[in-house]
Amino acid sequence: HVAQKIHSYKTNKDLPAVPGVKNIIAVASGKGGVGKSTTAVNLALALHAEGARVGILDADIYGPSIGMMLGVPEGKRPDVRENKYFVPMLAHGLQANSMAFVTTDKTPMVWRGPMVSGAVMQLLQQTLWDELDYLIIDMPPGTGDIQLTLAQKVPVTGAVIVTTPQDIALLDGKKGIEMFRKVDIPVLGVVE
């Protein structure tokens, strides 16, 4: 069972919890196009199939795809409460939120690192997650600002690294593993 393997890891970070979330799993890759979003969705659906309450956050601001993968109609927007909090979309039993849900269609994000990290943190903290056992975060590719901000400010339970067998992808995957180790986030597994 997937849930049993993940549950054995507990974050030891002294960071504030994300309201309504017990465990946060980051799904990351060193480079794009390796199947990270597909893995994130499949992990979320597998945990849900085992009876867990699961959410998924699309933190890939520059190339969000979770909405499309879950069949959320293009242009559909989450409800907003108190002019501040997003109500996550529901799709296939998963609670979901994405920058794609709160920005205009086909508008490329041309933000720099601090703005992007701030937007991801805002999306994470201002979504009304409803008592999740697991929140799967589909990270953008690489080991940059978003990954470091998340590692330093969010109690991430563990990470799953996604790669392909090509030499470049494997090297980038190793960088991702090393980054998570340096910030004391256990790597739960590598998907190739």
Regions found by a protein language model. Give the residues of each.
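Phosphate-binding loop that captures ATP/GTP phosphates
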Residues: 47, 53-106, 111, 117, ...
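Walker A/P-loop phosphate-binding motif and the immediately C-terminal alpha-helix
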Residues: 23-60, 177
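Phosphate-binding/switch loop-helix module in NTP-utilizing enzymes
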Residues: 100-150
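Conserved catalytic-core segment of NTP-binding enzymes
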Residues: 126, 133-192
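Amphipathic alpha-helical transducer elements in NTP-driven molecular machines
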Residues: 18, 63, 113, 117-121, ...
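Extreme N-terminal, non-catalytic leader segments
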Residues: 1-28
